Amino acid sequence: MRECISIHVGQAGVQIGNACWELYCLEHGIQPDGQMPSDKTIGGGDDSFNTFFSETGAGKHVPRAVFVDLEPTVIDEVRTGTYRQLFHPEQLITGKEDAANNYARGHYTIGKEIIDLVLDRIRKLADQCTGLQGFLVFHSFGGGTGSGFTSLLMERLSVDYGKKSKLEFSIYPAPQVSTAVVEPYNSILTTHTTLEHSDCAFMVDNEAIYDICRRNLDIERPTYTNLNRLISQIVSSITASLRFDGALNVDLTEFQTNLVPYPRIHFPLATYAPVISAEKAYHEQLTVAEITNACFEPANQMVKCDPRHGKYMACCLLYRGDVVPKDVNAAIATIKTKRTIQFVDWCPTGFKVGINYQPPTVVPGGDLAKVQRAVCMLSNTTAVAEAWARLDHKFDLMYAKRAFVHWYVGEGMEEGEFSEAREDMAALEKDYEEVGADSADGEDEGEEY
């Protein structure tokens, strides 16, 4: 069996975790107490969901997941919520004082008190797996726990499970809707520390999700629940191939093989369609061609950047539901003719396609309409560098005045780490620039890789 362990870190990670596991349970017919009624199982006979759930002797299905936060309030909601019986109490790990939006607290002072306990729990989960293929780590860039503790955890996972894949789902700080002043510091410190430990990181920009909720679902003031439910649909689409019998991206390494041309260039852009409210869906056909086309609209992306200004290095289309290859080929052919899609010149214009016949599930009473088919596009494009440039700029504005730096130094960090992290980010921006440059100019630059 090819199991995946999900690790949800900090408030953002935990709340997205709630939305994701709620959706997984609905998709696999698992009740909030972990039981799977026998009438549900006979039909499929597909046990691929065991990659995400382990079954106990009593027939209860337990998520292969760990929830970690340095303060208890958010995880206490899981402990008392609808799905409290789903998780093993040991899978919900809380500290006593939070990281106070401070990377240094999450990574050094508070984080190191709890890291061994967390690794011990992860080890227990890993021991239940017959063929662990890797970890999915959910966290935000901006929070103290999400940034600091995640980077500490990733370093330790690399030591303990060197060969296993580590995929991240990272919440990128929204330009308009900021929850902390020091988000740029935390983001850049965590990106620098995790860059060499993460194999593939899907970024989700809160603001992009806000806009999608406002525009496509007519929610005037989206709440985090609205955002998380939308994010969970995307996560579910990306992981559907791991949880149902599929043909493409059946394991985590395949994602990397398909999307990551160089180790550092591992930030694919995710786009999901159709995001549509029930009232509208009733009057629309949403054909394969339409939803495929929607994926190339910057408005449907999870990160605000414009791929029309960048070049594509790789592109995966993951369909689910009532989709036949003939329609997909036609849709892609149309897009190739009329879209201004530029691939880098060293990469053939290949679209990799996966089809999963399990139709998308929606949370009852949620915002999304139940549709027959959906698509998630994962593309590695040089346009993502725009997102880094925005963050780096904000970092520079604050760091030029050394604003707030004393809070980090006071927790045992050295100021040199800031400039080191910033230099690494500058190098990352440069890497993106070079990858997009035409290969004819870059003959002498091959030594770096």
From Swiss-Prot:
Keywords: Acetylation, Cytoplasm, Cytoskeleton, GTP-binding, Hydrolase, Magnesium, Metal-binding, Methylation, Microtubule, Nitration, Nucleotide-binding, Phosphoprotein
Cofactor: Mg(2+)
Record-level Gene Ontology MF annotations: GTP binding; hydrolase activity; metal ion binding; structural constituent of cytoskeleton; structural molecule activity
Positions of post-translational 3'-nitrotyrosine modification: Y282, Y449
GO biological process: cell division; cytoskeleton-dependent intracellular transport; microtubule cytoskeleton organization; microtubule-based process; mitotic cell cycle
Cited Gene3D superfamilies: Helix hairpin bin (1.10.287.600), Tubulin/FtsZ, C-terminal domain (3.30.1330.20), Tubulin/FtsZ, GTPase domain (3.40.50.1440)
Sites marked Involved in polymerization: Y449
Record's GO cellular component terms: cilium; cytoplasm; cytoplasmic microtubule; microtubule; microtubule cytoskeleton; nucleus; vesicle
Pfam family, one: Tubulin_C
The protein's enzyme class: hydrolase
Cell compartment(s), UniProt: Cytoplasm, Cytoskeleton
SUPFAM superfamilies: Tubulin C-terminal domain-like (SSF55307), Tubulin nucleotide-binding domain-like (SSF52490)
EC number: 3.6.5.-
Binding sites annotated in the UniProt record for GTP: Q11, E71, S140, G144, T145, T179, N206, N228
Biased composition (Acidic residues): 431-449
Phosphoserine: modified positions: S439
Sites bearing N6-acetyllysine, chain numbering: K40
Region described as Disordered: 429-449
Entry domain remark: The MREC motif may be critical for tubulin autoregulation.
Record function comment: Tubulin is the major constituent of microtubules, a cylinder consisting of laterally associated linear protofilaments composed of alpha- and beta-tubulin heterodimers. Microtubules grow by the addition of GTP-tubulin dimers to the microtubule end, where a stabilizing cap forms. Below the cap, tubulin dimers are in GDP-bound state, owing to GTPase activity of alpha-tubulin.
Family as reported in the entry's similarity comment: Belongs to the tubulin family.
PANTHER family named among the record's database cross-references: TUBULIN
Protein name: Tubulin alpha-1C chain
Organism, scientific name: Homo sapiens
Gene encoding the protein: TUBA1C
